Amino acid sequence: MYSKLNYSHQKGDQALKHPHLVRLQQSEVRGFTDMPNNGASTSSAGSFARQDSLTIAASLQQRDRERHPVDFMETELDLGDYLQVLHDLDVPTDNVDFDDAELQKCNILYDGEHPYEQPELNGYERHVAYGTGYRVPGDYDQDGYKMNCEVKAETPDFGATKTRRAVKRPVPYDDYQKEYSEESSDMTDNDGSVDDSYFEPKSKKTKSAGLENFKPQTRARKYKLKADEEKAEPTYKLKRARNNDAVRKSRKKAKELQDKKEAEHDKMKRRIAELEGLLQSERDARRRDQDTLEQLLRNKGPMKEQRMPQRHILENFNK
C-alpha cells in the first residue's frame, strides 16, 4: 500500500519505500510517480499539495484497462489500492484550501451553505465530524433553507350526506316502461322518508298487469278430452281402473318406505338415549369409587413400623 505523502515545501517528495510499490515501479505498470506532483491537484494558495483521489482512481482504472483490454469488466479488481489512497490523504482539518477546484464546485452546488438542518453536537463531536468550519445552527436562520413544498389540504364540500335512499324490486321486462313512467318518476334519491332497508311492495295493479302480460316459456302437454261415447266403452273404464290401481300402489309403497325410515329413526334415537344413560351411570360409578378411595386414604392413619433394637434381637437369639 502507498505511504503518506509529504505536504511540506521544505522537504522534497520522498520516494515510496513500500516493497509492493517498488515492484510496481520496476514493472511496466508504474505507480503514480509518472504523474505531476504524484497525481495531486495543486491550488493557487499553495499551502499544500492535496492528492486528488478521483484522479488516482481514474488512473488505476486506466491501468487495469491496459492490462486487460478484452475482459476488463469480467476481471476482479483489487479495491485495496483505492481504499488505501483515500486513507493516506490525511488532510488536516484546520488547514483547508478554500480555493481548491473541488471545493469551489461544492460551493457552487450548495450555494455556500448546507441545505439541511444540522444536528445538535457538542464541541468534540463537531470537531471530529465536521472540523473547525462547522457552523452552529443558532448562528443563521434555518427556516430559510427549508423547501417550500407544502400543499394546502383541500377538502371537497360534499354537502349533506345522504343516509336514506329508495330501493325498488326488479319488475318484469314487459311492463318495465309503463311502471317506470307511472311510479318511478315519483321516487327520488333525495326522499328522506324512506329507510335504506325498506323495499316498497308492489301494488295490486302491478300484479294484475304482470299476470295479464305473462307469457309462458314452456309448452304444455297435449291433452284432449275424451268424448262421452269413448268414456262409455268398457275398455276405457278398464284402462282407467288399472291406472288408478297403479297410482294407489305406488303411493302406498312410498308411504310404507317413509314409515319404515321414521321407525328406524325412532329406534336409533332410543338406542342413543340408552347408551348415554349407560355411559352416565358408568361415570357416576367411577366417581363414587374415587371418592371412596380418597375417604379411606384420609381416614387411614400413618403406619408405625415397630422395630426392635438390635441388642434385643441378639439377646433373644442367644437364649
From Swiss-Prot:
Effect of residue 53 to F: In ju1518; Suppresses developmental arrest in a nipi-3 mutant background
Location, primary (coarse class): other
Compartment annotation: Synapse; Cytoplasm; Nucleus; Cell projection, Axon
InterPro entries: bZIP_sf (IPR046347), C/EBP (IPR031106)
Superkingdom of the source species: Eukaryota
Region (Basic motif): 237-271
Protein keywords: Cell projection, Cytoplasm, Developmental protein, DNA-binding, Nucleus, Synapse, Transcription, Transcription regulation
Name of the featured protein: CCAAT/enhancer-binding protein homolog 1
Gene this chain is encoded by: cebp-1
